[in-house]
């Protein structure tokens, strides 16, 4: 039987349609909500789902699969669970949680999923990076050897931080923990403007966990007024955000910082603060019916912080020589550094800056307890001139505290003890610094040099801050810059500041 040309054409068309009929279908694995409440959804039917995979509910809300059990999957919801009902469809996305990263993020405020919340529109050209990745291995790393200047005399001289280090800032509420972190960001402005190439620039990522929205807005204003937003990224999971977002925010910020580290640049990531992340994780774990341990935290709360902080690293020259420095913040209760979370993070980090309430109220700000604060690797990264200048000051301060405690009994002291008390009082006064006024490292060297070498010994304590401003204007700026060289303070270099310091001391005695 022969078809007419028109019929033959229709037959061919039908055959091709039937052949390609199934090609446009996309098969998704779906499940159904068994129960929902307190931000946790139990879903039946997602048999092939991966741990940590993103899912999407019928209402458009996203979630992450954390508990993979025989009968159902425990999913924590990123957002309000009021729109999710029993029996709703849940679709696998097939992707593990990822966030945008790249230079397009600089100057922006984003949430824990990398969605902009600053009203400046969508992000421009960027790449996406996994939130949870393995930390660099031993072979890919190099020991910390470059300084990361904070602009604070007390930190840069006594507890120096290197690029690639993890230095904990720990203290009670209202002791100035965030102030140290913000000063460090502000100090990078003049450090970055001095850098000749991209590999010297330090980009900052500030992760706000469980803070008030007004506090985050205030921080954005401070950074924008100081033109510091141009090299900073803010990740905000505020107190009004659900616990899963507060848990995720540090990992998101870390992934954004790792873009710079892995491309031969330098990043500083501030986690403010990890105590609130641990509380959010405890809330999620208890709602997922995971067994509680000490202080009702789950058994893997140590791993929660260790896998995050191990991602801070100084890369070897073969892998680009980039670095990411971590400054985690922990809030203590009534100065108890031996609680569960503080001891965990102290054991993970490479040192800690301890802030104390009584030091703060004595007017010593930043309120650093020099005896408890330590930097385990930072001295290898400290500038040679700074190391020469403040080498003995930590020991002198320790002796001063010992003698000062003894002197309270009012017994007569010999001349040596009185000299030690006198010098110690000056060495305690010199590191004081107003908030949001970081000092360039070469100026810090001059000020500390004057204090350590006895130029302030006969000066009233209340005139030291005026003297500090005066000597910085008298010392030759070229000489100050020469302190940054590898040679440090040679005998020839010491002679010129000695003469200037002697002369400028006279009006303040």
Swiss-Prot record:
It is found in: Mitochondrion; Mitochondrion inner membrane. Belongs to the ATPase alpha/beta chains family. One of its GO terms (molecular function) is ATP binding. GO terms for cellular component: mitochondrial inner membrane; proton-transporting ATP synthase complex. Mitochondrial membrane ATP synthase (F(1)F(0) ATP synthase or Complex V) produces ATP from ADP in the presence of a proton gradient across the membrane which is generated by electron transport complexes of the respiratory chain. F-type ATPases consist of two structural domains, F(1) - containing the extramembraneous catalytic core, and F(0) - containing the membrane proton channel, linked together by a central stalk and a peripheral stalk. During catalysis, ATP synthesis in the catalytic domain of F(1) is coupled via a rotary mechanism of the central stalk subunits to proton translocation. It comes from Triticum aestivum (Wheat). It comes from the Eukaryota. F-type ATPases have 2 components, CF(1) - the catalytic core - and CF(0) - the membrane proton channel. CF(1) has five subunits: alpha(3), beta(3), gamma(1), delta(1), epsilon(1). CF(0) has three main subunits: a, b and c. This is ATP synthase subunit alpha, mitochondrial. ATP binds at residues 171-178. Keywords: ATP synthesis, ATP-binding, CF(1), Hydrogen ion transport, Ion transport, Membrane, Mitochondrion, Mitochondrion inner membrane, Nucleotide-binding, Transport. HAMAP family: ATP_synth_alpha_bact. The record marks 373 as: Required for activity. The keyword Nucleotide-binding applies.
């Amino acid at each position: 039987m022969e078809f007419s040309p028109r019929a033959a054409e229709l037959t061919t068309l039908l055959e091709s349609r039937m052949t390609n009929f199934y090609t446009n279908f996309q098969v998704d694995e779906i499940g159904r909500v068994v129960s929902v409440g307190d931000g946790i959804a139990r879903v039946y039917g997602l048999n092939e789902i991966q741990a940590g995979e993103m899912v999407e509910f019928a209402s458009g809300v996203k979630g992450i699969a954390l508990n993979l059990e025989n009968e159902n999957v425990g999913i924590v919801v990123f957002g309000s669970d009021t729109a999710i009902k029993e029996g709703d469809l849940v679709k696998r996305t097939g992707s593990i949680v990822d966030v945008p990263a790249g230079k397009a993020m600089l100057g922006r405020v984003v949430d824990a999923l990398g969605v902009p919340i600053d009203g400046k529109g969508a992000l421009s050209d960027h790449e996406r990076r996994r939130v949870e990745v393995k930390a660099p291995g031993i072979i890919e790393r190099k020991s910390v050897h470059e300084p990361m200047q904070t602009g604070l005399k007390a930190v840069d001289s006594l507890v120096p931080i290197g690029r690639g280090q993890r230095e904990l800032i720990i203290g009670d509420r209202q002791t100035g923990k965030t102030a140290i972190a913000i000063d460090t960001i502000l100090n990078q402005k003049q450090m970055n403007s001095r850098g000749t190439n991209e590999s010297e620039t330090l980009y900052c990522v500030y992760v706000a966990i469980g803070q008030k929205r007004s506090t985050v807005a205030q921080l954005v204003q401070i950074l924008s007024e100081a033109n510091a937003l141009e090299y900073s990224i803010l990740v905000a999971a505020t107190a009004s955000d659900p616990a899963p977002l507060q848990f995720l925010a540090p990992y998101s910020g870390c992934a954004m910082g790792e873009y710079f580290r892995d491309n031969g640049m330098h990043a500083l990531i501030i986690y403010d603060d990890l105590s609130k992340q641990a509380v959010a994780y405890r809330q999620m774990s208890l709602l997922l019916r995971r067994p509680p341990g000490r202080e009702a935290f789950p058994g893997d709360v140590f791993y929660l912080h260790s896998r995050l902080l191990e991602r801070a690293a100084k890369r070897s020259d073969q892998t680009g020589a980039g670095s990411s420095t971590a400054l985690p913040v922990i809030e203590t209760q009534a100065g108890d550094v031996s609680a569960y979370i503080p001891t965990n993070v102290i054991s993970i980090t490479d040192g800690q800056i301890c802030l104390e309430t009584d030091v703060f109220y004595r007017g010593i700000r930043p309120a650093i307890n020099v005896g408890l604060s330590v930097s385990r690797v930072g001295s290898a990264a400290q500038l040679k001139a700074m190391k020469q200048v403040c080498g003995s000051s930590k020991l002198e301060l320790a002796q001063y505290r010992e003698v000062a405690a003894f002197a309270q009994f009012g017994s007569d002291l010999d001349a040596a003890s009185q000299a030690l008390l006198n010098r110690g009082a000056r060495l305690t006064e010199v590191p004081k610094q107003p908030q949001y006024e970081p000092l360039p490292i070469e100026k810090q060297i001059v000020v500390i040099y004057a204090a350590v070498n006895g130029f302030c010994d006969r000066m009233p304590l209340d005139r030291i801050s005026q003297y500090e401003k005066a000597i910085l204007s008298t010392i030759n700026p070229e000489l100050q810059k020469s302190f940054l060289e590898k040679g440090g303070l040679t005998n020839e270099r010491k002679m010129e500041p000695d003469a200037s310091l002697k002369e400028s001391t006279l009006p303040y005695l």
